Amino acid sequence: MIIRSPEPEVKILVDRDPIKTSFEEWAKPGHFSRTIAKGPDTTTWIWNLHADAHDFDSHTSDLEEISRKVFSAHFGQLSIIFLWLSGMYFHGARFSNYEAWLSDPTHIGPSAQVVWPIVGQEILNGDVGGGFRGIQITSGFFQIWRASGITSELQLYCTAIGALVFAALMLFAGWFHYHKAAPKLAWFQDVESMLNHHLAGLLGLGSLSWAGHQVHVSLPINQFLNAGVDPKEIPLPHEFILNRDLLAQLYPSFAEGATPFFTLNWSKYSEFLTFRGGLDPVTGGLWLTDIAHHHLAIAILFLLAGHMYRTNWGIGHGLKDILEAHKGPFTGQGHKGLYEILTTSWHAQLSLNLAMLGSLTIVVAHHMYSMPPYPYLATDYATQLSLFTHHMWIGGFLIVGAAAHAAIFMVRDYDPTNRYNDLLDRVLRHRDAIISHLNWVCIFLGFHSFGLYIHNDTMSALGRPQDMFSDTAIQLQPVFAQWIQNTHALAPGVTAPGETASTSLTWGGGELVTVGGKVALLPIPLGTADFLVHHIHAFTIHVTVLILLKGVLFARSSRLIPDKANLGFRFPCDGPGRGGTCQVSAWDHVFLGLFWMYNAISVVIFHFSWKMQSDVWGSISDQGVVTHITGGNFAQSSITINGWLRDFLWAQASQVIQSYGSSLSAYGLFFLGAHFVWAFSLMFLFSGRGYWQELIESIVWAHNKLKVAPATQPRALSIVQGRAVGVTHYLLGGIATTWAFFLARIIAVG
């Protein structure tokens, strides 16, 4: 008699038709909340409607229902992303000079927007070269399209239609997985399955398919383009895929097919999977064969990683076990209980993801210029500056978001009763030590970094250049950074034997790459000026962290307000009758953190913009002499505050200020308008609620006199609403001002 183990029963992971689709309900504003659904009594109603529409925690306390709403919303988000992408590709297909740019990327600028002449604004259509008039774009899409092997506007058009189909599909999926087949809570909490699928599927197969596309489509097409073949003469992508002989003409080892792979003779593939380092001298971008190799390697790693976790079969890691095994000599219970936190609090999960993704986005910003991945990207200075600035801002916002959701987790999801002596509890118990030390670090960095500048301004004002901190007087060389640069410059042939050049030209080593008479990249010298501004970076980053971390660690309680958790995530003050307790909510810390994030990122992008114009970007003469855009003035000018104001902000603002009457005039208008938006924010930040309520009541009196008073009572913004409106306009105005300043400058001189 054979005893079989009982067959595991198949788990039912979805509920069928849980919630009916009702247009009547959707049409009712505030249907998710009993209070808001009643309709407006006062104008505060519209603010509450916006504040709570996506705060799913406030609609219900059922974790399964919250999870389904978040999951469904993600499909809506993906749908919008596909719609946006489709629009980008459609503009490339319908309104752009892509084919002209492809034939001569060094002399023709990218443009995908032509302004219609309605009130004379066709002045904005500048001459981008090749007889095309339009607005110069700085998104880098042209460079990506070339790298992926797109050779005609018809291909862009087809891709745009494909993206629309996917947008519709995602919209349908969002509806289907909420109204027709909604996953159960257990499905959302099955982290091992999620990790396996995300690692092996999204990252593994995603990278593998991209590597395949690069080898079979991008590489051959780019090889033809680099050789100067007319895009119309190049075979179409499907011809390369279906006809191996075509590829074998370019890469002879293709004739052998998969034999070298199975016989472990992998070096045969080194024609199209390379490890060269450095930049392709024709395009100024990374070698596309290096990139294909990289994606293949990444794919292997993630396909392996996607088989690491224990699911239906009893092998592999369990995440709970891994976390609970993490105990050090100083960490008490270690990560015990972390598994439960991350599977029951999506805020905690989101917080970690935002912190990682924000940091990664900033890493991307730094790699886009130091290892420019796409052809002709490095010499398109406006695009380089835009990509750096964009990724820095996005990274900053994501990191502040991480702190926001960590604080929401602390207020709404943290259960102190069953958390004892684990890592989080231990951090909370010595939060005073953490915050006071961090505060000391901020004061130290602030006084010393700013003090160096003040010293230099004073010496400069007194006419004592020999007593300044500079490369020509008292040197403060960044010796550690220079050592790291040098190590990387020496790496090829030593630590990485197969490599012919270092990972980035910025490390050093002497060689520079120029494309079409413009510098793509060269070794970036670091000196006293960089040492000074890097300490300002350290200062602003630490202050941002201080504010955000204080908000998280004191979100539930503090000496001032021991019962803070009961007041919620955002509240103006601890009730009337307790003075000095305003602006202590977790939300207020996020609010204040945003201003310091703005400070920090502004200094970074100013540093980048000036440093690149001074020491990297420029033109090269026939004799090989490089002339930089601002003639290398960074090292001597940026060491005083006065220098930053005079030689960077003022000197480089001339293009945007003098843009009227030219194709850059829109930037001049934006520069003006965004300053106005920024100034408008101060009205919300520097005035009180009572002032406005008094004003409103006299205006209501006038309406009553004329018998035109509205049924909905006007109310002044609450304290929190006023600060939210204020910080929004502050950031929007500041970012748009910087954008206009940067682009008018770099399009004019780059």
Swiss-Prot record:
UniProt-listed GO biological process terms: photosynthesis
Can you tell me which residues bind chlorophyll a?
A: M683, Y691
Q: What is the recorded membrane topology of this protein?
A: Multi-pass membrane protein
Write out the residues that bind phylloquinone.
Answer: W692
Q: How is the cofactor bound?
A: P700 is a chlorophyll a/chlorophyll a' dimer, A0 is one or more chlorophyll a, A1 is one or both phylloquinones and FX is a shared 4Fe-4S iron-sulfur center.
GO molecular function (one)? magnesium ion binding
Q: Which Pfam families has this protein been placed in?
A: PsaA_PsaB (PF00223)
* Keyword terms: 4Fe-4S, Chlorophyll, Chloroplast, Chromophore, Electron transport, Iron, Iron-sulfur, Magnesium, Membrane, Metal-binding, Oxidoreductase, Photosynthesis, Photosystem I, Plastid, Thylakoid, Transmembrane, Transmembrane helix, Transport
Q: Which residues of this UniProt protein bind chlorophyll a'?
A: H675
Q: Which cysteines are joined by disulfide bonds?
A: none
Q: Which residues cross the membrane?
A: 70-93, 156-179, 195-219, 291-309, 346-369, 385-411, 433-455, 531-549, 589-610, 664-686, 724-744
Its EC number(s)? 1.97.1.12
Q: Which residues bind [4Fe-4S] cluster?
A: C573, C582
The record's catalysed reaction(s) read: reduced [plastocyanin] + hnu + oxidized [2Fe-2S]-[ferredoxin] = oxidized [plastocyanin] + reduced [2Fe-2S]-[ferredoxin]
Any one GO CC term of the record: chloroplast thylakoid membrane
Tell me the compartments it is located in.
Plastid, Chloroplast thylakoid membrane
**What function does the entry list?**
PsaA and PsaB bind P700, the primary electron donor of photosystem I (PSI), as well as the electron acceptors A0, A1 and FX. PSI is a plastocyanin-ferredoxin oxidoreductase, converting photonic excitation into a charge separation, which transfers an electron from the donor P700 chlorophyll pair to the spectroscopically characterized acceptors A0, A1, FX, FA and FB in turn. Oxidized P700 is reduced on the lumenal side of the thylakoid membrane by plastocyanin.
Q: Which family does it belong to?
A: Belongs to the PsaA/PsaB family.
Subunit arrangement? Answer: The PsaA/B heterodimer binds the P700 chlorophyll special pair and subsequent electron acceptors. PSI consists of a core antenna complex that captures photons, and an electron transfer chain that converts photonic excitation into a charge separation. The eukaryotic PSI reaction center is composed of at least 11 subunits.
> What is the name listed in the Swiss-Prot or TrEMBL entry for this protein?
Photosystem I P700 chlorophyll a apoprotein A1
Species of provenance: Arabis hirsuta
